Amino acid sequence: MKVLVIEDQTMVRELLALACKQALPKAGVRTAGTRADALALCREAPPELVILDLVLPDGDGLDLVPELFALAPSAKIIALSSHIDEFTLHRALSSRVHGILDKNEQPVRILREAITAVLDGQQYVSSLVQRLKASVRANPAAFDKILSDREQGVLRLIGEGLTNDQIATRLKISASTAKNHRLNIMAKLDMHSTPQLIRYAIEKGFTRIPEGPPRS
């Protein structure tokens, strides 16, 4: 079996690779620290199992999932992050990944459990992620129940501080349509200003605040 670990932190990457070797002693395990390196390795030899960190120095891990499936259609993908928020959970569940893990839960142990589960055809969601999932499901005001996919995309850009004109350019829509989306989002969330929307976008995980220099 070919396994690819995609993780930018060197120590964590080595620990995850070790966990894969322990769970699958006969597997060939390769590692990548960036999105670009991961895609290059996938083109050389499509993996059957991918361990994917969702925060990479050269791109969003979940944005990488469709490209991984294009290069390795039958691969099992286990996503992991130390920042599982509502929007990340929603995107991960919609992306067809086979496992979602929170790094704050003894990642080596739960990774071994996840590998066993996904290779057996199951979906694996770690306990902290399960709790968040249950909380979102029980909340009638959860964003995925009241905002359309397009509105979620617009909110993500609002969280980045983009104007209506900039959103229109990014999404290839008219500025008036972008404005209408903004107003509809405000109405649905019962908010009355762009700063409120930006705070909400950050709180729910639509937008991330940079955490300083790249990790080694």
Name each model-derived stretch.
Residues 31-49:
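Acidic, metal-coordinating helix/loop segments flanking the phosphotransfer/catalytic sites
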Residues 57:
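The feature encodes the CheY-like receiver
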Residues 161-196, 203:
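Recognition helix of helix-turn-helix DNA-binding domains
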